[in-house]
Amino acid sequence: MNLHEYQAKSLFAEYGLPVSEGFACDTAQEAVEAAGHIGGDMWVVKCQVHAGGRGKAGGVKVTGDKEEIRAFAENWLGKNLVTYQTDEKGQPVAKILVESCTDIANELYLGAVVDRATQRVVFMASTEGGVEIETVAEETPELIHKAIIDPLTGPQPYQARDLGFKLGLTPTQMKQFTKVFMGLAKMFEDHDFALLEINPLVITDEGNIHCLDGKIGIDGNALFRQPKIREMHDPSQDDAREAHAAKFELNYVALDGNVGCMVNGAGLAMGTMDIVNLHGGKPANFLDVGGGATKERVAEAFKIILSDSNVKAVLVNIFGGIVRCDMIAEGIIGAVKEVGVEVPVVVRLEGTNADLGREVLANSDLDIIAATSLTDAAEQVVKAAESK
């Protein structure tokens, strides 16, 4: 689960971190009034969506004219903002953040992630602020400095100072940076973050550290113990298909290929996507129907997969353990009839009564191809997708 910038900054403020005075506004009139309340003669107005790249897409404006603020809000509220991180539909803009303008002397980067390699929270800092960190990691990885947080001792001030020295901070800035570092580390643990980015973390003209942006991702598995964070969820930013799938306890992630995938088990689902890629195909989704591949769940899975107009063929890869493959085959046939599937469906069944399940599929009068192996299934579904 992701947070909006204004939500991230409200958390920053709670932990005593330096952020700009700002207000999240629902209407153009509120945006104008917010500028008046903030005061000054320059403001920054930003569309609030979860995707990055807002500035390049016209979703951020610096202005000294309140009527320009009104026009900006009227133009964007209720519309979708398309950036390089969204699909072609973009994400809806329901709020505009109005902030005081900050004079910037230098831009830095500060972020933290849960690192699988070290099994620790790892903080990353760089002098290359305002640039996508992925670009920095690829082109100049030596400019990214790291601090690994030991879960037994927690974050230590010396780690902040070490990063600060590498960023070239002055003694005064070092103290401010240490406060930011320690606050973010505590926040990361308190609220079960999975990702945290301040890009850019700026040094103002007065020489002070300031959090100019904020991006936060929460570990979805920990939301049960984060009631305050749950209330911040904005369902309008979620992929509609992913949200629909969650209602039926289906794990679905939309991708940009043309081969729909329906599998029981996350590991098998990832392996299925890999073998589709290996044979020249492009998966259109990740979809794990879970352990109970019932007719109802399979039918909903088909509906979700086929709501993507790019899907030209569907690969169903089911391992029958507790559930018999012949029962799964009957469920697939029933679901295909109910949904009215019009693209080729390749089914690979393995496990209990697999031969009987393949026989049931072969005897159906539907456009269902029973594969003999996972390799055969991948080859057939890629061929079917290419012929469409």
From Swiss-Prot:
PANTHER family: SUCCINATE--COA LIGASE [GDP-FORMING] SUBUNIT BETA, MITOCHONDRIAL (PTHR11815:SF10), SUCCINYL-COA SYNTHETASE BETA CHAIN (PTHR11815). Substrate binds at N264, G321, I322, V323. One of its GO terms (cellular component) is cytosol. SUPFAM superfamilies: Glutathione synthetase ATP-binding domain-like, Succinyl-CoA synthetase domains. This is Succinate--CoA ligase [ADP-forming] subunit beta. Belongs to the succinate/malate CoA ligase beta subunit family. NCBIfam families: PRK00696.1, sucCoAbeta. Binds 1 Mg(2+) ion per subunit. It catalyses: succinate + ATP + CoA = succinyl-CoA + ADP + phosphate; GTP + succinate + CoA = succinyl-CoA + GDP + phosphate. The lineage of its organism: Bacteria, Pseudomonadati, Pseudomonadota, Gammaproteobacteria, Alteromonadales. One of its GO terms (biological process) is tricarboxylic acid cycle. Residues 9-244 form the ATP-grasp domain. Mg(2+) binds at N199, D213. ATP binds at K46, G53, R54, G55, E99, T102, E107. Heterotetramer of two alpha and two beta subunits. Its EC number is 6.2.1.5. It holds the Pfam family ATP-grasp_2. Keywords: ATP-binding, Ligase, Magnesium, Metal-binding, Nucleotide-binding, Tricarboxylic acid cycle. It comes from Shewanella piezotolerans (strain WP3 / JCM 13877). PROSITE patterns: ATP_GRASP, SUCCINYL_COA_LIG_3. Pathway: Carbohydrate metabolism; tricarboxylic acid cycle; succinate from succinyl-CoA (ligase route): step 1/1. GO terms for molecular function: ATP binding; magnesium ion binding; succinate-CoA ligase (ADP-forming) activity; succinate-CoA ligase (GDP-forming) activity. Succinyl-CoA synthetase functions in the citric acid cycle (TCA), coupling the hydrolysis of succinyl-CoA to the synthesis of either ATP or GTP and thus represents the only step of substrate-level phosphorylation in the TCA. The beta subunit provides nucleotide specificity of the enzyme and binds the substrate succinate, while the binding sites for coenzyme A and phosphate are found in the alpha subunit. Its cofactor is Mg(2+).
